[in-house]
């Protein structure tokens, strides 16, 4: 009898140890503002031989569902974990507490508010980051993080190949219809798509565009062209994301979407970003694109607490 019961008891014990499967009811009960389960600045084991990606999320910004930098970065970290040999490290509030994390990162990503208050441009930080660029570290900026004042943007041109320049570039909300995609590792597994976001365009690019590859392009409504530069380009196709092969051998990527947190539920949106981070870290992107499995319920995790009103769940694009 014991020979029969022992395996059954062992199975039961294992089931209890693992716990019940996550259900929709569990997701509904979960605190959407609980960020305690996201490991911060967690380094890999000493014997780790893969690629390290440092993901830096900005401070709280905008209203609920917009500029959810921490929650979006947590999602991105989970997506990157689906690629073997990649170790994402999450830092928060615009800058890592442990600056030594920069020294071992194969790629550095910033997802935060930019312009004059950009965490990257404060004090001597650009000089510190230049040292990382000089050793070939990948550089990735998402959404508002691509926005720099001209005096800082000149340096960023060498890091990322382009940036959003105030009063030159423009930042409207519009439905971008991406009809064609270039042959590039970042576009592997990505299909043409249409998605509403705050897609910036009219980027400041260098005169010498060698090494620069537009990744996402679409034709915006002419009514959104309100700067002198963009007004002169009515009907023209515009670039909303780009890759840059730097002269030093490093790689940069700029992505202007990411205003609406809900867009992480779009598979092509996720795959472009994940592929780009892998590419920037010099990880071979699979021919079918990176794995980006995602549960839409995760849109409502790790959010910043904004406002005092009743919580309204964030739904995927097109859902009501």
Which functions belong to the PLM regions below?
Residues 1-5:
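Positively charged n-region of N-terminal signal peptides that target proteins for export
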Residues 31-41, 165-248:
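Catalytic beta-strand/loop cores that center a nucleophilic Ser/Cys/Thr
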Residues 49, 72-76, 101, 125-129, ...:
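Stable alpha-helical elements in mature extracytoplasmic
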Residues 6-19:
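Bacterial N-terminal signal peptides
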Residues 18-26:
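Signal peptide processing junction and immediate N-terminal pro/mature segment
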């Amino acid at each position: 009898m014991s020979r029969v019961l022992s395996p059954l008891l062992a199975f039961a014990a294992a089931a209890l140890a693992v716990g019940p499967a996550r259900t929709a009811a569990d997701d509904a009960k979960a605190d959407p503002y609980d960020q305690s389960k996201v490991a911060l600045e967690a380094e890999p084991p000493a014997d780790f031989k893969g690629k390290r990606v440092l993901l830096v999320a900005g401070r709280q910004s905008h209203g609920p569902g917009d500029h959810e930098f921490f929650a979006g970065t947590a999602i991105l970290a989970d997506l990157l974990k689906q690629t073997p040999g990649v170790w994402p490290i999450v830092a928060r509030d615009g800058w890592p507490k442990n600056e030594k994390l920069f020294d071992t990162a194969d790629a550095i990503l910033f997802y935060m508010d930019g312009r004059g208050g950009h965490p990257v441009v404060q004090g001597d930080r650009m000089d510190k980051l230049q040292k990382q660029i000089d050793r070939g570290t990948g550089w990735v900026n998402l959404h508002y993080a691509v926005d720099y004042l001209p005096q800082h943007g000149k340096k960023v041109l060498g890091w990322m190949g382009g940036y959003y320049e105030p009063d030159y570039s423009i930042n409207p909300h519009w439905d971008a219809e991406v009809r064609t995609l270039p042959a590039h590792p970042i576009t592997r597994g990505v299909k043409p798509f249409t998605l509403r976001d705050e897609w910036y365009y009219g980027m400041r690019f260098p005169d010498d565009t060698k090494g620069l590859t537009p990744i996402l392009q679409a034709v915006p409504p002419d009514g959104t062209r309100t700067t002198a530069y963009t007004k002169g380009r009515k009907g023209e196709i515009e670039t909303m994301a780009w890759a840059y092969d730097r002269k030093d051998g490093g790689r940069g990527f700029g992505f202007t979407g990411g205003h609406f947190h809900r867009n992480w539920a779009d598979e092509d949106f996720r795959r472009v970003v994940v592929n780009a981070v892998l590419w920037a870290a010099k990880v071979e992107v699979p021919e079918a694109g990176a794995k980006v499995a995602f549960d839409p319920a995760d849109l409502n995790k790790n959010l910043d607490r904004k406002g005092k009103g009743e919580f309204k769940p964030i739904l995927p694009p097109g859902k009501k």
